[in-house]
């Protein structure tokens, strides 16, 4: 029974582990199929591929932060070419938007709380390949202003209005397909820390996402119980969508989510249930 995790983050975005550490964790946890899905960047994929042992199947991926009509969502791209021009053009635009958001948050913290970052801290923030509020939260925790990232974001960052810096979902799906990849709706009932939507709320959104070109659903997820998973698997089957699954592992930056955890019970899920892996590895 092969163990898989198709939703993993490194410090190329907002994960705490570098690639070498991540590979060690993957090996120690006996994972045999993995995907690197950093937020809005593909930069780690080539290096990760070179570090992964040969007995582990590595899938190059990305997680794009999107809006599809009025649906705020994350779209995973699997089996992508990280050098694809259309995908990289989109990602480069995203980097500029993230820097604008970063500047807004820095100014907000200064004006609202009198918090000013040192030159070294600012240099570190601006050097991130895909800067997110987690990085700011890390600095606030180091200063002793909060006990963890969640507290730092809740108390200092979340109230800051930054405007919409999400990708247009249709363009994101197009870019993933242009890169030879498979677009999959990530944690479609709600992600880590989010309120899970009801089945009645989900179904109309699913129809919209299908019309925009998604080809799969992340049915197995670290925060989904068996009832939610079975519902999503049925929806995937009814709509001829591929099934994916992942932990959404971020290391210390999202505590309580071990790598390889694909349900709330943390029971082993055979990779054969993730139909997308068979398609990618045997296509």
PLM features: what roles do these ranges have?
Residues 1-72, 155-162, 167-168, 173-254:
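An N-terminally biased module of ancient metal coordination in phosphate/nucleic-acid-related enzymes
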Residues 22-25, 78-80, 94-98, 236-238, ...:
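Short, low-complexity, polar/charged sequence segments that are solvent-exposed and flexible
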Residues 51-204, 208, 269-281:
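Extended substrate/RNA-proximal surfaces in nucleic-acid metabolism proteins
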Residues 249-283:
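Catalytic core of soluble alpha/beta enzymes
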């Amino acid at each position: 029974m092969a163990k898989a995790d198709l939703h993993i983050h490194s410090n190329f975005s907002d994960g705490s582990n570098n690639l070498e550490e991540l590979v060690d964790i993957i090996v120690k946890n006996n994972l045999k199929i993995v995907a690197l899905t950093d937020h809005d960047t593909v930069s780690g994929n080539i290096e990760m591929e070179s570090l992964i042992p040969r007995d582990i199947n590595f899938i190059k991926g990305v997680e794009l932060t999107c809006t599809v009509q009025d649906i705020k969502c994350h779209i995973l791209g699997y089996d992508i070419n990280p050098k694809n021009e259309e995908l990289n053009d989109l990602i480069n635009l995203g980097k500029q938007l993230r820097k604008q958001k970063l500047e807004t948050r820095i100014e907000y913290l200064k004006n609202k709380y009198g918090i000013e970052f040192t030159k070294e801290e600012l240099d570190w923030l601006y050097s991130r390949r895909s800067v997110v509020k987690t990085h700011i939260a890390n600095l606030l925790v180091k200063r002793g202003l909060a006990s963890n990232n969640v507290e730092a974001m809740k108390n200092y960052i979340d109230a800051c209005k930054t405007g919409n810096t999400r990708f247009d979902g249709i363009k994101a799906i197009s870019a993933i397909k242009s890169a030879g990849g498979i677009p999959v709706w990530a944690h479609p009932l709600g992600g880590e820390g989010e309120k899970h939507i009801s089945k009645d709320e989900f179904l109309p959104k699913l129809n919209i996402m299908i019309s925009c070109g998604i080809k799969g659903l992340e049915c197995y997820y670290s925060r989904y119980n068996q009832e939610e998973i079975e519902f999503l698997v049925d929806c995937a089957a009814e709509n001829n969508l591929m099934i994916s699954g992942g932990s959404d592992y971020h290391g210390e930056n999202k505590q309580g989510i071990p790598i390889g955890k694909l349900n709330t019970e943390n029971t082993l899920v055979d990779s054969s249930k993730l139909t997308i892996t068979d398609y990618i590895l045997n296509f």
